[in-house]
Amino acid sequence: MSDSAANNILSIYRRHADAFASQRSRALFEKSWLDKFITVMGGQGSIVDIGCGNGQPIAGYFIQQGFQLTGIDGSPAMLARARHSFPAQRWLEQDMRELVLNETFDGLIAWDSFFHLTQQDQQKMFPIFDRLSHPGSALMFTSGTDNGIAMGQFEDEPLFHASLAPDEYRALLSAHGFAVVEMMMEDPHCAGHTIWLAQKTG
């Protein structure tokens, strides 16, 4: 069940883009963490939003702060909404697991997207984070609290989530040149999200 649900993630977001857009909160409860991310970046530069969805509210917040943004998503319908809202930015239809970008960014964010990958695919993302970053780049992503799989539901379909253990995330970050700046389990001020903020050191 979990393997088929993991393989169905892109299909769900492609078929239910309108439902996601209507249900996604725009309250920006993430703001304090987005501001921390900006601070680690140095307050300026380019950002890649991996799993950007329709661009609201996270990509939109960065754009309003003056950042040049590249949004990556596997749902054409969501990207169409993002392009309509922010035509001056770059929006690319790609699977994050096979991300092809021949450049580095000052900030990399995978908020509520990376955790839809299987544990094996999450492990394989760290060389991609490494390749897309340079010394000083900020990286932020959300995860679960411990090693395991959790099933949610969206539009009456099973919605796959997975997580590695915190020690494994720390080891993967370190192995690919990132130092953890801050990590918080189930932040009560951020809708219970577990958040990792790191910086490329070498």
Question: Model-derived features: where do they sit?
Answer:
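Conserved class I S-adenosyl-L-methionine
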Residues: 1-42
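Class I SAM-dependent methyltransferase SAM/SAH-binding core
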Residues: 48, 54-98
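A conserved beta-strand element that flanks and buttresses the S-adenosyl-L-methionine
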Residues: 109-110
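A short glycine-rich, Lys/Arg-flanked "PGG" loop and its adjoining helix->strand segment in the class I
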Residues: 123-135
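Conserved beta-strand signature within the Rossmann-like core of class I S-adenosyl-L-methionine
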Residues: 136-143
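Short "lid" loop at the C-terminus of a central beta-strand within the Rossmann-like core
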Residues: 144-149
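Acceptor-substrate binding/catalytic loop of class I
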Residues: 151-167
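Core SAM-dependent methyltransferase catalytic element
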Residues: 185-202
